[in-house]
Amino acid sequence: HTPEECKELVRYAHRILADNPFDLRRMAVLVYANNLLDNESEVLFWQARIHHLVDAIISTGDGCTPETAWYIIEPVHAYDLLNTLGVIAESYDFCPPCYDYIQVYDLIGNARGFYFNVSRILEEYQRKFVDE
């Protein structure tokens, strides 16, 4: 990307983050674009922000059972976390009442799965879209 394109990426990412401050993918765009612009302080800032949000998710459990599921507030956070862990999502199942189970494979082909508590997402959906 050219410097002008990178500046445009930064502008758009900031606009999106103003509306959705937990958008990990836009933060990654800021790391990428600022790196190309040699803006080291911004790169470090956004890398730290990503790590803090990922750490916040990981601190909610271990993802191995529904009882220890990781809490997420956006469905995409599950896939962002899995990407951070270096695994590849293979399949998805919803496990009532409020868990997403994602089967993954690591780079060697070992299979396992992780649970994500999506209760906050479901509550927000109910609040906004379901007629009483």
How would you describe each model-predicted region?
Residues 1, 14, 30-35:
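Conserved small-residue packing positions in alpha-helical repeats and bundles
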Residues 1-10:
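Helix-turn-helix repeat elements of alpha-solenoid scaffolds
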Residues 15-16, 50:
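Canonical positions in the second alpha-helix
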Residues 22-30:
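Glycine-rich, often proline-containing surface loops adjacent to acidic residues and nearby aromatics
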Residues 24-25, 52-66:
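Boundary/linker segments of alpha-helical solenoid repeat arrays
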Residues 34-58, 86:
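TPR/TPR-like (Sel1-like) alpha-helical repeat modules
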Residues 68-132:
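Terminal, low-structured helical/coil segments at or just beyond the last alpha-helical repeat
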